UniProtKB/Swiss-Prot annotation:
Transmembrane segments: none annotated. It is found in: Cytoplasm. The gene is thrS. This is Threonine--tRNA ligase. GO terms for cellular component: cytoplasm. Its cofactor is Zn(2+). Catalyzes the attachment of threonine to tRNA(Thr) in a two-step reaction: L-threonine is first activated by ATP to form Thr-AMP and then transferred to the acceptor end of tRNA(Thr). Also edits incorrectly charged L-seryl-tRNA(Thr). It catalyses: tRNA(Thr) + L-threonine + ATP = L-threonyl-tRNA(Thr) + AMP + diphosphate + H(+). Residues 243-536 are annotated as: Catalytic. Binds 1 zinc ion per subunit. It comes from Acidiphilium cryptum (strain JF-5).
Amino acid sequence: MPAITLPDGSVRDYPGPVTGTEIAASIGPGLAKAALAMEVDGKMMDLSRTLDADARLRFITRRDADSLELIRHDAAHVMAEAVQALYPGTQVTIGPAIEGGFYYDFFRNEPFTPDDLPAIEAKMREIIAANAPFTREVWDRDEAIRFFEARGERFKAELIRDLPASETITIYRQGDWLDLCRGPHMRGTGDIGGAFKLTKVAGAYWRGDHRNPMLSRIYGTAWRDQKELDAHLKQLEEAERRDHRKIGRQMDLFHMQEEAVGSVFWHEKGWRLYRTVEAYMRRRQEEFGYIEVRTPQLLDRKLWEASGHWDNYRSHMFIAEVEDEDKVLAVKPMNCPCHVQIFNHGLRSYRELPLRMAEFGACHRYEPSGALHGIMRVRAFAQDDAHIFCTEDQIADETVRFVEMLRRVYADFGFPEFAVKFADRPTPRSGSDEVWDKAEAALRSACETAGVEFTVNPGEGAFYGPKLEFVLRDAIGRDWQCGTLQVDFVLPERLDASYVTAESGRARPVMLHRAIVGSFERFIGILIENCAGRFPLWLAPTQAAVASIVTDANDYAETVAARLKEAGLAVATDTRNEKINAKVRDLSLALVPNILVVGRREAEQQTVSIRRLGSDKQDSMTLDEAIATLKAEATPPDLR
């Protein structure tokens, strides 16, 4: 006789096995109508599933944020049905719900184009209107393989073959169409509603491997109501306007090319911006007691085997074989094993702890070409990486110190608010459950001490320890995970790190892995999009441009530019034989924040007319006043 505990703490007893649908109906007709799925002991399930034991149950309705994943998952299935109805012979592969929407990958001779989307969307609306129920079926593995092979669905057959032997093979039907799926789903296609839209097409390799067939991917977005959909579509339009790749070209900051996939060619202005961010982070790290080091790019396989990266991270590493020396080297994907080597070089004392070791380390990680995105997702990058070697008793204080530094950095870059996620043990991982229990408890305790509130991000920790993930929200409401703090008891053990205790014994340090901005490349992409290229003056790669009205003022324009440069400002000069309106237009398109216009009158009076980006108004002031004003505005926040 199952006893079902509801969120309000009340318990309902049932005489025998009971479905979620029956439980909802027993509570009331309103819930029976509103319930879309249920969460049973923390696991999402279809309402049709039968419960035959005591459980904690929560119903998911359209008011719950959890319903979004259900809506998007179901929409992906309906899109796949619509595609196969309209384009017979198309094979389906995988189609998950993702943040903000869903997608499905298809295999066909002709890739889809944006022109195909209206017809697919219309067919989806037909299927949704029919409100066919989602029905879960458990199939025999061999039967499922034979079924999909007979239908020419070789990708589905491959997926089933690769599932663990212990995995239950489940199929979901919606009317006459079916798909391999773990679920859960809502009651029927009608629960999706009409607040969805197909947004774009793209290419993707099967399983992200360029050696596999190229698939045609269709993206869509789905929401609980039209208001949410409209807001999201508006956000997408704004994101397109702010796209860092477009603005990067417009401002001449960087470019990417096929000969160096996933690597950035920084142009003069972009590199100036990069160095400004790096210099700021260097000053902040010095302020908070970090030493800076530099470690090698290529390291012997033996070190990566000892650290655990070879077993847990090799698929993301670039490997190089040295034939003459019979060695296998790897380009470092992260700096942590290298920092342990510096810690181990010589005898360490407890008096040296905490030791805060930082490196703007260049790292390389393999990412499938289809996953790369401008400078925001690359293969070659540098990050504000640091490792704190400390005792267990120092974890809480170091966490408080780190969070304070992080708050200042984010505020200075224009992100005064952030959220925190606690990422716990993943599979696979290094270290025993006992060690993980200890690490997770230490990090939770440190969060309490630091006053950090968090939500749990299950299974997303690093293979060597749990971590905090710090998530920024940008100007148009998008979230970006940048900072991390990870507690690691595993790596010091694996790499035999130790220090001399106060009692002259030996002990292992705890290793705190931390980053604030993370990848400089990605963070600069976020900065570009957050301010749409209109940087605060201290970050602007070109802080001012001097434009002459007439050629007679060219010499004075050069003098003004020289004075501004002497004051430490990044300055451009436009003395072309063009009309001033054309110069102002070109400099505005390049998003130069301050245009100093000079003509014969300004030259005679030693003044300038300043036009701010986006303003038609010009302010006249003496050259000395202009220099003082701009110099003050261009001073980095930590130096004011």
